[in-house]
């Protein structure tokens, strides 16, 4: 028996089990603190993990509900959460994902109250040689956002991609990707535009590159990003580079972040293949 994953919401677990049953794969649920999903036939593990990655992208897809009807489990007596939106948020996000989201929101509120400049004096990339040993500055620039749309866009992608990485590969992997991409994307961006920039987008682009390439080269990792979304990311970089939308974008951070994510995914997938 091989444990595939755990769900906080037992109804979500049952939906996945029902769907896999329609695909000819038998999974079982064991209730502990969470709903643990187990696979008896370990030879099917790769297929199940690939399907799990797709399921986590959109658990509300009609095909999963249809599978529950087909399996006869829609009236299973499981407890439905009162707030499915927040249950979905918790389902995908681990502690590191939440900590970064909360930190970004707190910094954003502080910027609205104190003003952008006041907060940037404390968190921006070192803008004076005397600040080069204030090491937090090499990372905290990623926590600053300058509009509601800016922070919503970045946090949505952070939750979607960072949560998947943390759930499947662990908090440590997400921390490493975040710190390395924040450092290197910040370094490149300050070479382009100076120290007065901010936002999580460099890290988000690193996660896009990492999740896409790792999923392509190592499907057993359980993470996956549709090719259409990585194409969208590339189009957005080109649009920002040529200023097609008249918006100020951290183009250097975007390119550097994407490169960092791709490089880390290549190395990790190479190591995964060597272990087989």
Curated annotation (Swiss-Prot):
EC number: 3.4.21.105
Family annotation (InterPro entries): GlpG_N_sf (IPR038236), Peptidase_S54_GlpG_N (IPR022732), Peptidase_S54_rhomboid_dom (IPR022764), Rhomboid-like_sf (IPR035952), Rhomboid_protease_GlpG (IPR023662)
Catalysed reaction equations from the record: Cleaves type-1 transmembrane domains using a catalytic dyad composed of serine and histidine that are contributed by different transmembrane domains
A biological process term (GO) from this entry: proteolysis
Hydrolase recorded as keyword: yes
Keyword Phosphoprotein: no
Subcellular location: Cell inner membrane
One Gene Ontology term of the molecular function aspect: serine-type endopeptidase activity
Active-site residue list: 201 (nucleophile), 254
Entry keywords, A to Z: Cell inner membrane, Cell membrane, Hydrolase, Membrane, Protease, Serine protease, Transmembrane, Transmembrane helix
Membrane topology designation: Multi-pass membrane protein
Transmembrane segments annotated in the record for this chain: 94-114, 142-162, 169-189, 192-212, 229-249, 250-270
Function: Rhomboid-type serine protease that catalyzes intramembrane proteolysis.
Entry's family note: Belongs to the peptidase S54 family.
PANTHER family: RHOMBOID PROTEASE GLPG (PTHR43066:SF26), RHOMBOID-RELATED PROTEIN (PTHR43066)
Protein name: Rhomboid protease GlpG
Organism: Escherichia coli O139:H28 (strain E24377A / ETEC)
Organism lineage string: Bacteria, Pseudomonadati, Pseudomonadota, Gammaproteobacteria, Enterobacterales
Designated gene of the protein: glpG
